[in-house]
A protein has these predicted regions:
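Core subunits and conserved enzymes of cellular information-processing
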Residues: 1-132
Length: 132
């Protein structure tokens, strides 16, 4: 099946896994998805991730974090820039997610990074998603 938006598929798999408290989810591998998983791990939204190599595409196994009781570590993930409507921002226009409680992930000329890192390094780019 041809997938129109693989990043939205990744975010949906993580969102659904968190909601039903799965220990892990598998996602088809790509470099961009691996970078997004690295940022989610560094920011504390997921426990870990592992790249599983195969002779075809491979996969990224994401180990999810869960809070106490009904509390979630990831409340929601929102795709911002889509294949049909790209959203870009300059270095001074990077939006804050829920007053600084969440993060946004940007694809910049210096690689994939959070909005805070992009503002600190002085680069703008395409807003991939928001996580809170």
């Amino acid at each position: 099946m041809n997938m129109t938006d693989p990043i939205a598929d990744m975010l949906t798999r993580i969102r659904n896994g968190v909601r039903v408290k799965l220990p892990k989810v598998d996602i088809p591998k790509s470099r961009l998805k691996a970078e997004i998983a690295r940022i989610l791990k560094d920011e504390g939204y997921i426990a870990n991730f592992k790249i599983i190599e195969s002779e075809h595409q491979g996969a990224i196994r994401v180990f999810l974090k869960h809070g106490q009781g009904d509390e979630r570590v990831i409340t929601d993930l929102q795709r911002v820039s889509r294949p049909g409507c790209r959203i870009y921002c300059g270095k001074t226009e990077i939006p804050r997610v829920y007053g600084g409680l969440g993060i946004n992930i940007l694809s910049t000329s210096r690689g994939v990074m959070t909005g805070r890192e992009a503002a600190r390094t002085g680069v703008g780019g395409e807003i991939i998603c928001n996580i809170w």
